[in-house]
Amino acid sequence: MGRAIGFDREKYIELQSEHINARRKEIGGKLYLEMGGKLFDDMHASRVLPGFTPDNKIAMLERIKDDVEILVCINAKDIERQKMRGDLGILYEDDVLRLVDVFRDRGFLVNNIVMTQLEDGNSQAEAFIERLERLGLTVARHRIIPGYPANIDLIVSEDGLGKNDYVETTRDLVVVTAPGPGSGKLATALSQVYHENLRGVPAGYAKFETFPIWNLPLDHPVNLAYEAATVDLNDANVIDHFHLSAHGESTVNYNRDVEAFPLLKSLLERLTGTVPYQSPTDMGVNMVGFCITDDEVCREASQQEIIRRYFKTLVEEARNGLDTTQSERAAVVMAKAGIKSTDRPVVLPARQKAEETQGPAAALQLHDGTIITGRTSPLLGCSAAALLNALKHLAGIDDELHLLSPESIEPIQTLKTKHLGSQNPRLHTDEVLIALSVSAAKDENARRALDALKELQGCDVHTTTILGSVDEGIFRNLGVLVTSDPVFARKSALYQKR
């Protein structure tokens, strides 16, 4: 039994590419299209809109790629703070390189990187710029503009956007993207419009922001899931009062777009003498809302995503010794959605197993609703146990049968503790999978269990203690959606190995 589908992927590709082409014709000249969210690997969208694939947006752009040039932004401050893409477990700066490779592999033109919010003394950002230039990429430096976005007189001047490097592009549709939010995509697009018009090149701006979905209600779980995903930015969905005033229609946008709209309107007025947009919603080209085929499926998926985001904030606060600001914001979003953390089906079974066994435990929900649990034993960690139990269930193997015998596990434990310096003899998920792969050469049951791995894609897991980076990474690679209680397995330890 697979995951329920609530979104029409093919309709989206067709409708969205047509709408972008229509906007290009309306604007005339060069169009800078800010791509909100992730252009590639949009895991969030695929979780809250079942049927939307992580590469949906890039597949849509492939329809018109001969007219497209990609411009990738990265915020210098994100390099300094070593910000990571949580869904992929890589640094933003590494993701810039990955994105360039992915775009080029799919036949897109991408030669330029924009370093935003660059300040003197940011040595890490400058080192990354040098690295990019050695790789043959052109890097534009964009500075912090005091008073952005409120000080319009300064922004639209030689001392504002005029101080930014101009990026020379060769195509009429320039897609501005980034590893994640807060990277400066809007400012980059506006800077380019400013510089193009100085050079006598007609240029305009439009925005493709998947979330919030403008034609869904403000409190729809899909839109609330976006708020939960951006608690670190303190973003909030709001009614677009500009659109309501201009068109008498209530639509949803997010606070930073609404706040920045007067800047965009003023910029376009000063540059071209005309204002094509009366509201932030007018700026957008998003057709996602028209491609939802089952609202209830998307509501349920989004509610589960909100809960996952809540647990994620709790774990990050525990790991990094942070205050509770972000988890409190996430809790507010849960309250708006009318849900609680235990509405995640795997939470209570994991906690009940932990209480029964007096040790860390895990619970995994299969696509048919079956809950599989795993306990901590002298041989296996709870995540590894739950993984093996799930594979046995999926492969139709008797629960009493050992896929890995104690005799096969003990040499691995000896290697870990006596030769590799580990204090924890229990096998992690990666070690279990390697052992299972070795066994599969001669054991039919092990072979069947390995074949069942693909059925874990999109399943949910909850653990009663914070996972280490190894188990977290294995689950991520398998496409399993993991949450944890904000408790360390060794509560008394000051240094918690990740």
Swiss-Prot record:
This is UPF0371 protein cauri_2449. Belongs to the UPF0371 family. InterPro entries: DUF1846, DUF1846_C, DUF1846_N. Gene3D superfamilies: dip2346 domain like (3.10.630.10), Domain of unknown function (DUF1846), C-terminal subdomain (3.40.140.40). It holds the Pfam family DUF1846_C. HAMAP family: UPF0371. It comes from the Bacteria.
